[in-house]
From Swiss-Prot:
Gene Ontology MF term list: ATP binding; ATP hydrolysis activity; ATP-dependent protein folding chaperone; protein dimerization activity; unfolded protein binding; zinc ion binding
Known role: ATP-dependent specificity component of the Clp protease. It directs the protease to specific substrates. Can perform chaperone functions in the absence of ClpP.
Segments forming domain ClpX-type ZB: 1-54
Keywords: ATP-binding, Chaperone, Metal-binding, Nucleotide-binding, Zinc
Taxonomic superkingdom: Bacteria
HAMAP family: ClpX
Organism: Streptococcus mutans serotype c (strain ATCC 700610 / UA159)
Binding annotation for Zn(2+): 13, 16, 35, 38
PROSITE patterns, per database record: CLPX_ZB
Entry-linked Pfam families: AAA_2, ClpB_D2-small, zf-C4_ClpX
Name of the featured protein: ATP-dependent Clp protease ATP-binding subunit ClpX
Family: Belongs to the ClpX chaperone family.
């Protein structure tokens, strides 16, 4: 074979001693030779060592109180949801650590995937991202509305796994301990409780396809994404230890809860349980309500941990703007500091930003765009105005009826 002989001299692998006739390939280096078998062996050793490093990391998972403290430093409000997530994530990685360190297990511990229900902008995606970052595990986000069942135009569910593998730099062992967040899961609910005679391409069929990878299976993933074809090489990944967090707004589910609790939406009825505000209905959601909304029982059964998030108030949004480690106000203050300019927000300005986000029904995710709108002209002009030392954002500036106040050195 080409490259195995040097001027008809017998070449031996410097590591195992085999000659070129005993192996498929020998690669020449600077005074050394290595055969294909030793290359494969070294790759296997590296893979095993990396897998052991992953397992060692899992044995040091922060306890629920420690995870909650991490979430508290980045996420405002949603205390009940954060507690539920902290416990579920700790139990998940504790299960992996102990199961894989002990060969003989009397009890088969099932994993506890998570369903998050809450309005747009309430922090579902950010909570999942923060957990993955704090644990230093691969993380991927998928949009359920882009998925279709096999045989239809759209994205196969296996492509979700490819995103996780890519996040792990194609280290499959590390990806197998990662976290996947599937957003907009409510958008693939069945259209009503009665099964249609037509194919529900983006509904029950997608739930069934997701169910397989969520509950745990060895999946074949196309390394370049897209649809599978017979000649394509596949990446094999075991999903039994991947934590799946799915989330959605589930608009209208509070009405299902009201009906179950005996409170009529129209007319009169006897209240079996008095609930004071809409956000409290979210804390009363049970699997029966989710099934009535349109998720199939088998799918719900693989998501035993329910974390309900509440609508954020003006006060919550103001705290989000100012208090977390990576608060938006701190980010923009840092940006302007690079130009030697201080940035201040009046309290009324912060409240006006929060109020706009609520009116637009964008929640926390809409805060940045509102600040960008308010500060666009300012950030365009400031770099060219060397005499400006401080900028103050007022309520009128947020409302668009006046400009921010500039202070100069003179």
């Amino acid at each position: 074979m080409a490259g195995n002989r040097t001027n008809d001299v017998t070449v031996h692998c410097s590591f195992c001693g085999k000659n070129q006739d005993e192996v498929k390939k020998i690669i020449a280096g600077n005074g050394v030779f290595i055969c294909n078998e030793c290359v494969e062996l070294s790759q296997e050793i590296i893979r095993e060592e990396l897998a052991e490093e992953v397992l060692a990391d899992l044995s040091e998972v922060p306890k629920p109180k420690e995870l909650l403290a991490i979430l508290d430093s980045y996420v405002i409000g949603q205390d009940r949801a954060k507690r539920a997530l902290a416990v579920a994530v700790y139990n998940h990685y504790k299960r992996i650590s102990f199961t894989e360190s002990q060969d003989d297990q009397d009890v088969d511990l099932q994993k506890s995937n998570i369903l998050m229900i809450g309005p747009t902008g309430s922090g579902k995606t950010f909570l999942a991202q923060t957990l993955a970052k704090s644990l230093n595990v691969p993380f991927a986000i998928a949009d359920a509305t882009a998925l279709t069942e096999a045989g239809y135009v759209g994205e196969d569910v296996e492509n979700i796994l490819l995103k996780l593998i890519q996040a792990a730099d194609y280290n499959v062992e590390r990806a197998e301990r990662g976290i996947i967040y599937v957003d907009e899961i409510d958008k693939i609910a069945k259209k009503g409780e009665n099964v249609s005679i037509t194919r529900d391409v983006s509904g029950e069929g997608v739930q069934q396809a997701l169910l397989k990878i969520i509950e745990g299976t060895v999946a074949s993933v196309p390394p370049q994404g897209g649809r599978k074809h017979p000649q394509q090489e596949m990446i094999q990944i075991d999903t039994k230890n991947i934590l799946f967090i799915v989330g959605g707004a589930f608009d209208g589910i509070e009405d299902i809860v009201k009906q179950r609790l005996g409170e009529k939406i129209i007319g009169f009825g006897q209240n079996n349980k008095k609930i004071d505000d809409q956000s409290s209905y979210m804390q009363e959601i049970i699997s029966e309500d989710i099934q009535k909304f349109g998720l199939i029982p088998e799918f719900i059964g693989r998501l035993p941990v329910l974390a309900a998030l509440e609508q954020l108030t003006v006060d919550d949004l103001v705290k989000i703007l100012t208090e977390p480690k990576n608060a938006l106000v701190k980010q923009y203050q840092t940006l302007l500091s690079y130009d030697g300019v201080e940035l201040e927000f009046d309290q009324e300005a912060l409240q006006a930003i929060a109020q706009k986000a609520i009116e637009r029904k964008t929640g926390a995710r809409g805060l940045r765009s509102i600040i960008e709108e308010t500060m666009l002209d300012l950030m365009f002009e400031i770099p060219s105005q060397e005499d400006v030392t401080c900028v103050r954002i007022t309520k009128k500036a947020v409302e668009g009826t006046d400009k921010p106040i500039l202070e100069t050195a003179s």
